[in-house]
Every structure is written in structure tokens, then in C-alpha cells.
Design a protein with these regions (language model features):
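Nuclease and nuclease-like effector domains acting on nucleic acids or nucleotide cofactors
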Residues: 2-143, 155-173, 198, 219-241, ...
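Domain-level detector of nuclease and nuclease-like folds
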Residues: 137-313
Length: 313
């Protein structure tokens, strides 16, 4: 689908250039990569892009957005907002969304997404079932949490309700306390609420792994990053990047592309290329198709990347 271009943030650019002033050795690399990326003469491999410092990655992407109006149509970032009436019918609150996920989608598939750990009706994880005994002393590792594959902060942080919740009367409690940005957006922004509670974007995860992944982007880390027992998840806090297990990459890719198309969220060209690759390499299996059908029956909208899977260019 066509997508409306989102302009670069002046604040983000100023922060990026201020960072480079403090780290002068990045200037040459940043200038070269950004310039070549702008003209489109060279597309950096996404695995190499993942290894760049986050400030440099963001600066390159923001530079592309700034010159986007000057580029040929085929190179542009374009987004089209989804009308409110076209949004999926998702749960009205977070508690209901989680309960629906566990009781109506995963009721007979009680294993976590990334690490394949078994869990019981009380959402207590059997760490021995997936080789995560090394986390036995971590209380958060013993519970299941609903993980946003497309991080909520990524589609919330540019919204006014997230940035300035104090401006909304509905975001103040009876005692005068101002709600957090996430809580405020859930109250006043229907599109955010729908995306936040969309079951297509929610997966049961070991709580500790969910917390360590935080809101990091997906990508490749080669051998750089923390690992957890027998789980193939790898996370690098300095790069703010997480490399998922091979078995989860196809589902992650199709989820990210679904969220992009359904809610108009922006993905960088590097991210899109990565997700196309993962989608092509890892087609949906029987459970992913069944999961999609169950969610479609609940929300009225399925994930077309699962339902009508095909190789992406």
C-alpha cells in the first residue's frame, strides 16, 4: 500500500550532530555513508547497518528522510494513514488483551515465542523445558508476559499524548496525578489503543527476556551480545539491538510488516529489506496460520502476510 512520508524531526537531527561533535571519529564514516545512501548509489547491507552505533544509524535514516522530496518516487518513504473505521476491533484495555491472548489464542499452545519454554495455566514458566535454568534466580524469568514484537514506544513516542500527557485533561487522575505517556495515549488516542492491544503484535514471552529486549530494534549481531542459556536470543544493550532465534524471524517479519500496513508506522529501508528477507526464508508454518485464523475470528482482520504468504521482492 502507499504510505505518506513522515518528515524528519529537527530535534533528532540536532541530537545526532551534537553526538558526532563529541565523537569526531564518527564524522568521516557518517558523512560518507549518509551521502552515498542519500543518492541511492549504494545500499549498505542490513547486517552491516545493524553494527553501526545507534546514533549514526538514526542520523543516516533521518538524512534520507530530509532529502526524500528530492528523490525519485521509487526511493521515497510514503505512508497513508488508516481511517479509524478501518482499524481492527481490538480489546478495549490491556488486561482484556492479555487475557484474550492467553485464553483464546494460546490456550492449547502454551509455549513462549522466542525460547519455546513451556508454561502452565498460572502463566508460570518451566525454565527447565527450554534450557533457561541459568535464570532460575530471576523472579521475572518465572512468569509469562505479553510481548509487543513491534515495540509500543516506537509507535507512541512521536504522538503528542505520549510526549505531553499533561496537556490532556483526561490524562489526569482525580488526585491530580498525570498519567504516563503510554497510559494517556490509551485513553485519548484510538489508533494507539488499537495498535497497543492488537493481538497480531502480541506473543507470550519469558518475562526476563521480554525485559532485556526492551524496545530494541530487530537485526543481526553476529557474535556480539548477551545470550541466555539454550535460548538463541541475542541482545546487545550498547547497539540497542536484538537478534531473534532463527525459528522466530519469519513471524517477526510478518508482524512488523502487518503493523506498518495496518497503522501506517514507519520502517527504515534497511528494516524493510531485512523483514522481506526473513519472510522469504521462513514461510509461515501450520501454527502461525492457525494463530492468524484465531486472531482474525476475534478482531475481524487477519495478517495478509500470513494468510496470503508469498515471496517478497
Amino acid at each position: 500500500m502507499s504510505r505518506r512520508r513522515v518528515p524528519a524531526s529537527k530535534t533528532d537531527l540536532l541530537r545526532f550532530f551534537h553526538t558526532l561533535r563529541q565523537r569526531p571519529r564518527l564524522w568521516l564514516l557518517g558523512a560518507v555513508v549518509a551521502c552515498v545512501s542519500v543518492v541511492g548509489a549504494f545500499q549498505m547491507p542490513h547486517w552491516a547497518m545493524d553494527l553501526l552505533p545507534p546514533e549514526l544509524r538514526q542520523g543516516i535514516q533521518q538524512t534520507r528522510l530530509m532529502v526524500d522530496p528530492l528523490l525519485p518516487d521509487a526511493w521515497r518513504y510514503r505512508y497513508e494513514p488508516v481511517p479509524a473505521e478501518a482499524l481492527p476491533t481490538t480489546a478495549s484495555n490491556w488486561t482484556l488483551a492479555r487475557r484474550t491472548l492467553y485464553e483464546r489464542v494460546y490456550h492449547d499452545q502454551m509455549h513462549t515465542f522466542y525460547c519455546g519454554c513451556q508454561y502452565d495455566e498460572n502463566l508460570r514458566v518451566d525454565l527447565g523445558s527450554c534450557g533457561l535454568d541459568v535464570l532460575a534466580d530471576r523472579s521475572r524469568a518465572l512468569r509469562v508476559e505479553a510481548e509487543h514484537v513491534f515495540p509500543a514506544s516506537h509507535f507512541g513516542q512521536f504522538r503528542r499524548c505520549w510526549q505531553e500527557p499533561d496537556r490532556y485533561e483526561a490524562c489526569r487522575t482525580a488526585g491530580g496525578r498525570t498519567l504516563s505517556g503510554r497510559e494517556c495515549c490509551q485513553r485519548v488516542d484510538p489508533a494507539f489503543l488499537a495498535a497497543h492491544n492488537d493481538l497480531h503484535n502480541l506473543f507470550p514471552s519469558v518475562g526476563y527476556i521480554n525485559g532485556r529486549r526492551s524496545n530494541y530494534n530487530w537485526g543481526y549481531l553476529l557474535w556480539f551480545g548477551d545470550t541466555y542459556g539454550d535460548c538463541e536470543m541475542r541482545i546487545n544493550r550498547w547497539l540497542r539491538r536484538a537478534e531473534p532465534p532463527v525459528a522466530a524471524r519469519g513471524s517477526i517479519a510478518r508482524t512488523m510488516l502487518y503493523m506498518r500496513d495496518t497503522y501506517g508506522f514507519r520502517l527504515s529501508r534497511w528494516d524493510e529489506r531485512r523483514y522481506y528477507t526473513w519472510n522469504n526464508q521462513h514461510p509461515p508454518d501450520a501454527w502461525e496460520r492457525e494463530r492468524n485464523q484465531r486472531i482474525q475470528a476475534i478482531q475481524g482482520v487477519g495478517n495478509a502476510y500470513v494468510e496470503h504468504w508469498r515471496q517478497l521482492p
